[in-house]
Amino acid sequence: MPEPIAFDESQVDISSIDFSDLEAKYHVPEPEHSYEHFVICDGAPIAPEAKAPVLKKVLTKLFSQCGKVVDMFMPLENGQTKGFLIIELDSAAAADKAVKQLNGKKLDVKHRLAVNKLPDMEKYALNDNISEEFREPAIPEFRSHGYLKSWLLDPNGREQFMLHHHDTVGVYWYKKNIQPEEVIEPRAHWTSASMKFSPKGTYLFSFFPGGVQAWGGERI
């Protein structure tokens, strides 16, 4: 059996060998860093620096309801927090959940949070359609909806009452021993649940899955 040939790799000059084809074939690209799991929270309390750890603990507990909080950056200026912070969550899904659940949430009586994903903020900030010049907002001309308590001016001194039968709701004038008179023509599908008068009778509320609508004035 032949003896093995001794081979010292350090003695081989590879400077003249072109590996570009192999490098291109087996190149592993660096993963593109994504900010989809980052959110910006505005509207937080402006607190002294000494109370920043307590505030951070409260907000960490709040955002932990949406996913694991990896990191939280709370900038300081002149010895106090600036009212906003950047939160890194463990996934883009957790960031989406944070925006959905916590945007607009009241932290206390004076503070309401505004939560947005970091890429969205960059998208709006880099949008050429957004002007940096302040423009006075156009205020629409006031339109009167009539006297909201016009029913108090009824010459016969009658009260109003509401009837809800199946899908139809009607509002009527009432006076004892007199056939009820329609205030407005009964409407079908005016509400998806019930309807209620406000405590002082100024408004009539209809309820829908998407919210509540108020009705009032001489012509509801």
Curated annotation (Swiss-Prot):
Pfam families with a match to the protein in the record: RRM_1 (PF00076)
InterPro entries: EIF3B (IPR011400), eIF3B_RRM (IPR034363), Nucleotide-bd_a/b_plait_sf (IPR012677), RBD_domain_sf (IPR035979), RRM_dom (IPR000504)
GO-annotated molecular function: RNA binding; translation initiation factor activity; translation initiation factor binding
Location of the RRM domain: 37-120
Swiss-Prot/TrEMBL keywords: Cytoplasm, Initiation factor, Protein biosynthesis, RNA-binding
GO cellular component: eukaryotic translation initiation factor 3 complex
Family: Belongs to the eIF-3 subunit B family.
Protein name: Eukaryotic translation initiation factor 3 subunit B
